[in-house]
């Protein structure tokens, strides 16, 4: 069947999802509607409403937009059914109830930013970098009742350089995700008859192009949602662990640590965000969290080696390189990072 004859409802919210929607629209796929989150209140008094990146793109291209507060809302379900989608494509969206994902006859597939079954969860890109992985990728799979466990359709790997932060990996997987979304639709279309879908055994077709997730004996890494407390640096770990941790959360939301005065002089602790570090083969010369200042360079002792800080930001100040920070913060030797 030609791709133009498959009616697609696209579901997504952030910039990551826009690239996939854009690829479908620009390459002639038949996107009949878009589902995204409701506009979010922003501003000091929450008086303004900000549409999602996906909504903005959809409106620019005259695509109908649905923004349900609750995915089981009867009016939303009725409106969704009215588009008579053959297939639903999900990229960076919320959990879907069965009444939604089971609606189209060609199923609902998700583009997940990891090589499933590894890194099931809300933050797969972050956790892959945090764990020091050298490879991740994207997976398309059919949604089912459990999170990120459905039958796998296609997978594509993506190499993670040792110096890459999560922004680099995010961008790479965003474009790779758009490519695999199109290839998945093309694969499904290639297994369908040219004329009519009336007498097609859809279960047989979809099972024929997908396979159950196989866990074997490998340790499964999970990708839970990132919270502020998740981002606190533990200096009692190795320099490599801290280095990867910073990469995996930079530039957003950013890791942080509490800078405390060594002396009991009533000086208030400071919160420092750390955006970039560099590994060192020099052995630590003090307890974890204590600082080593060498002219324009700043190091932190970890459980094994010194870790150099390169790009930081104190609360209420602008982000800056360490050289600029040291020029304006003359008493840094009197501080250390909290480790408890």
Spans of model-derived segments:
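Short beta->alpha connector loops
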Residues: 13-16, 69-72, 92-95, 280
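N-terminal Rossmann-like dinucleotide-binding module
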Residues: 1-45
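N-terminal glycine-/serine-/threonine-rich beta1-alpha1-beta2 phosphate-ribose binding loop
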Residues: 41-84
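Internal anion-binding site segments
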Residues: 210-340
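Donor/substrate-binding cores of folate-linked one-carbon enzymes
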Residues: 6, 27-30, 87-222, 229
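Structural motif corresponding to alpha-helix initiation and N-cap regions
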Residues: 18, 51, 73-77, 94, ...
């Amino acid at each position: 069947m030609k791709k133009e004859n498959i009616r697609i409802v696209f579901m997504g919210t952030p910039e990551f999802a826009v690239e996939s929607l854009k690829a479908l629209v620009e390459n002639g796929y038949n996107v009949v509607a878009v589902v995204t989150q409701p506009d979010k209140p922003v501003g000091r008094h929450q008086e303004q409403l900000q549409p999602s990146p996906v909504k903005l793109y959809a409106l620019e291209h005259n695509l109908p937009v649905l923004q349900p507060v609750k995915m089981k809302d009867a009016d939303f379900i009725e409106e969704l059914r009215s588009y008579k989608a053959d297939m639903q494509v999900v990229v960076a969206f919320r959990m879907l109830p069965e009444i939604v994902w089971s609606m189209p006859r060609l199923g609902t597939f998700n583009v997940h930013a990891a090589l499933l079954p590894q890194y099931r969860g809300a933050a797969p890109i972050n956790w892959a970098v945090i764990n020091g992985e050298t490879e991740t990728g994207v997976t398309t799979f059919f949604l089912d009742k459990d999170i990120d466990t459905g039958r796998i359709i296609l997978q594509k790997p993506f190499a993670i350089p040792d110096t890459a932060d999560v922004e680099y990996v995010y961008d790479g997987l965003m474009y790779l995700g758009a490519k695999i979304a199109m290839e998945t639709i093309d694969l499904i279309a290639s297994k369908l008859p040219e004329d009519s879908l009336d007498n097609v055994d859809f279960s047989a077709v979809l099972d024929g192009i997908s396979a159950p997730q196989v866990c074997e004996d490998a340790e499964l890494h999970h990708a839970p949602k990132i919270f502020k407390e998740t981002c606190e640096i533990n200096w009692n770990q190795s320099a490599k662990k801290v280095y990867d941790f910073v990469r995996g959360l930079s530039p957003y939301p950013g890791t942080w640590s509490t800078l405390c005065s060594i002396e009991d002089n009533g000086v208030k602790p400071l919160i420092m965000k750390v955006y970039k570090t560099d590994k060192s083969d020099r052995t630590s010369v003090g307890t974890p969290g204590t600082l080593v200042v060498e002219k324009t360079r700043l190091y932190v002792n970890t459980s094994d080696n010194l870790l150099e800080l390169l790009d930081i930001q104190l609360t209420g100040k602008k982000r800056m390189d360490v050289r600029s920070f040291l020029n304006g913060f003359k008493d840094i030797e009197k501080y250390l990072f909290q480790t408890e």
